[in-house]
Amino acid sequence: AGMGIGLMFFAVAEPLTHYIAAPLGDPETVEAAEQAMVLTFFHWGIHAWAVYAIVGLSLAYFAFRHNLPLTIRSALYPLIGDRIYGPIGHAVDVVAILGTLFGVATSLGYGVNQINAGLNTLFDVPISPVVQVVLIGLITALATTSVLAGLDAGIKRLSEWNLFLAIALMLFVFIAGPTLFLIGAYVQNIGDYIDQLAVLTFNVDAYGDGVWVNDWTLFYWGWWISWSPFVGMFIARISRGRTIREFIFGVLFGPTLFTFLWMTIYGNSALLQAVNGMADPILQLVRDGDTPLVLFAFLDTLPFSAITSVLAIILVIRPYGLFGTHEIERV
């Protein structure tokens, strides 16, 4: 839910934000566009999945090799032994639940704002706290129903359809957009990301005011960590029977490369419009802080925007219906 909603919310908005407010160099230049994708990759790349891999591997190892419960407390077994079954273990699980709630709250906020923005774009539904409270109630009801239903065939089918819709929308943007440019941009983005990975990782803005690092990098690290109990538990459950090498390769590189592809298709398509002076209305939304509207404004530049906007709203809503069935009961 966290990654899915974030990918919808930030795929266009984050690159454009870094483009018009470049932390390095001059804004709104070709160089700023290139750097914007590197920064986006940095926040959505291997660091996030490394956090999930550490938690997931710890849980999987102790659960499947030592027959311990598939809960966060089991990772502390080498330190406190059988006391994981007592108050200390219970406290660890409670902290994990509270941490996950912070991640859910963040994702819920982004998701509700974007759903409201999509409804405003399509049906002129006002963007207001009242509408958003109603949406929160509906989404909470959907998530509660999902938890009560459990991981049955219907939930699995819903998850598969969600993935199918996401890939279909991404392929549409790829085909309807600057296809050849996106292929080259994907390759170059990865190269630039690898080239600057160490520098960005150790950048704490020691010689500056640290505002950008706090607002972006530290925010993302906190968001990924808050989701790590849930995502790590899910990864552990589906990884039984894999070797550690297979686990690390599958968790770190597969999702990262797909995320990079997603961000390239959406982000570079919008950046190309911006560099060519064709995205002034979208850039104005970014400047005005109307970030939830940015994705729909971008889709409006492509054919069949009404259909793709509906699909985007569905993709934001559906992760809540998939969130937290079996895993949430185990956290």
Q: Where are the language model's segments positioned?
A:
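Membrane-embedded translocation segments of transport machinery
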Residues: 96-242, 249, 254-308
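Cytosolic-side transmembrane-helix boundaries in multi-pass membrane proteins
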Residues: 312-331
